[in-house]
């Protein structure tokens, strides 16, 4: 009976077949210890001289890393074995042998080497754990919104304009010289969806032509972007907190083994799963950053009216044991579509959610302008071509209502939950300013 490693605990004292690859091998006297991987996990298999045909024992002594195998044996519970179980091998069959020396041996390798061989590095424990957690987060995102009655709404990747009027766009030439751009966000289209279906979410790749070499930036990354009709700024933040606490709790519940592989202490994530995220206004956050800057020379002062940089976000987020909201920024440093604060029109009803431990922003959201004339004026103030946004203005001409939404960056969220130093490890094949291969 063929089984997978992630279900091995259900087959103790049973004869099973595993199909996979040799990850590591060592020998001690009359025992060969084979660490097998099958895409669902890693398992120790023991080949004992005298318990298998001599030809099988000799074969096991000369298997190179990444040999593809079929292995038959009995599952045993053994606390000494990695994962608490092992396979007592009865027989094995080589399906294929590596053609040459496998590049990623047991010695230490630098990150550039590993990224050059990303197509092979994905087979190893660390990327395995990260991708399993990423997969769990994606599944949980769909479950979260599906259970709350949201419609999955697919936004186009080719768009005629930028969402926020930025120049950081990848341009694509279409037919007859017409130009389009790779989407930076599905938000504008999600707004159309929300006014048709009340509550929607988009989930897909987005593109930013940023010449950034920071640990938080990719050229291509994934975002989930919900949008809800009649939702206020306060309700928007409540939904963000509910989502993030749900995601963290799901990983703690189902991916503790992978967190252990990464050396990530689950206790560091438990406060985030509980909710109760602090809220700071932009003004309060600037004051806190400047107090920190007086104590820490690595944190630059932040004049009021400027946006937070990575050092500011990191310094702020380290003061909290769970994500923290920063809300109500000056309108002049935020996007044209954000609703002004009725208590102070110089501010907007927006928020950023910063992950703790120095990870910084993982969510940006706002209440959107729903008044036609105000939105038209903002488009003009930002120097944007009104004809490109005419369809977007239609959303305000016909049945306009207050509405809100946000975008959660998947890779930044994965990096925080996994405790990664760089977002390049949070996506299978990262696309960065300095890397486009493999």
Swiss-Prot record:
Top class in the EC scheme: ligase
Listed EC numbers: 6.1.1.22
Location(s), subcellular: Cytoplasm
InterPro entries, per the entry: Aa-tRNA-synt_II (IPR004364), aa-tRNA-synth_II (IPR006195), aa-tRNA-synth_II/BPL/LPL (IPR045864), Asn-tRNA-ligase (IPR004522), Asp/Asn-tRNA-synth_IIb (IPR002312), NA-bd_OB-fold (IPR012340), NA-bd_OB_tRNA (IPR004365)
Catalytic activity: tRNA(Asn) + L-asparagine + ATP = L-asparaginyl-tRNA(Asn) + AMP + diphosphate + H(+)
GO cellular component: cytoplasm
One Pfam family linked to the record: tRNA_anti-codon
Keywords from the named record: Aminoacyl-tRNA synthetase, ATP-binding, Cytoplasm, Ligase, Nucleotide-binding, Protein biosynthesis
Primary location: cytoplasm
PANTHER family cross-referenced by the UniProt entry: ASPARAGINE--TRNA LIGASE, MITOCHONDRIAL-RELATED, ASPARTYL/LYSYL-TRNA SYNTHETASE
Sequence similarity: Belongs to the class-II aminoacyl-tRNA synthetase family.
Name of the molecule in the record: Asparagine--tRNA ligase
């Amino acid at each position: 009976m063929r089984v997978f490693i992630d279900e091995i605990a259900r087959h103790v004292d049973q004869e099973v077949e595993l199909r996979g690859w040799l990850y590591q091998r060592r020998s001690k006297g009359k025992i060969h210890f084979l660490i097998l991987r099958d895409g669902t996990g890693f398992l120790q298999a023991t080949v004992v001289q005298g318990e298998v045909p001599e030809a099988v024992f000799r074969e096991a002594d000369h298997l190179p890393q990444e040999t593809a195998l079929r292995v038959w044996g009995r599952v045993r519970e053994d606390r000494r074995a990695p994962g608490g179980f092992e396979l007592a091998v009865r027989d094995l069959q080589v399906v294929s042998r590596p053609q040459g020396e496998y590049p990623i041996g047991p010695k230490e390798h630098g990150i550039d080497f590993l990224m050059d061989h990303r197509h092979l590095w994905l087979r190893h424990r660390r990327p395995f754990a990260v991708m399993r957690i990423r997969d769990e987060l994606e599944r949980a995102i769909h479950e979260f919104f599906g259970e709350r009655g949201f419609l999955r709404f697919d936004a186009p990747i080719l768009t005629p304009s930028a969402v926020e009027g930025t120049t950081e766009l990848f341009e694509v030439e279409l037919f007859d010289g017409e130009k389009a751009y790779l989407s930076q966000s599905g938000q504008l289209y999600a707004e159309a969806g929300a006014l048709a279906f009340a509550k929607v979410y988009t989930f897909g790749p987005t593109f930013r032509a940023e010449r950034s070499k920071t640990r938080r930036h990719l050229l291509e990354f994934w975002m989930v972007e919900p949008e809800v009709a009649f939702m206020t700024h306060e309700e928007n933040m409540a939904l963000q907190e509910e989502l993030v606490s749900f995601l963290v709790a799901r990983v703690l519940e189902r991916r503790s083994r992978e967190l252990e592989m990464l050396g990530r202490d689950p206790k560091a994530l438990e406060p985030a799963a509980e909710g109760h995220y602090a809220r700071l206004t932009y003004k309060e956050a600037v004051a806190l950053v400047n107090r920190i800057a007086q104590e820490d020379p690595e944190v630059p002062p932040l004049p009021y009216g400027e946006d937070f940089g990575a050092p500011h976000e990191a310094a702020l987020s380290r003061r909290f044991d769970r994500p923290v909201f920063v809300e109500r920024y000056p309108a002049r440093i935020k996007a044209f579509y954000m609703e002004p604060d009725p208590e102070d029109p110089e501010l907007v009803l927006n928020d950023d959610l910063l992950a703790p431990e120095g990870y910084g922003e993982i969510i940006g959201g706002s209440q959107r302008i729903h008044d036609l004339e105000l939105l038209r004026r903002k488009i003009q103030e930002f120097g944007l071509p009104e004809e490109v946004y005419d369809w977007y203005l239609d959303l305000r001409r016909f049945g306009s209502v207050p509405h809100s939404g946000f975008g959660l960056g998947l890779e930044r969220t994965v990096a925080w939950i996994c405790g990664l130093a760089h977002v390049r490890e949070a996506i299978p094949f990262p696309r960065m300013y300095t890397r486009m291969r493999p």
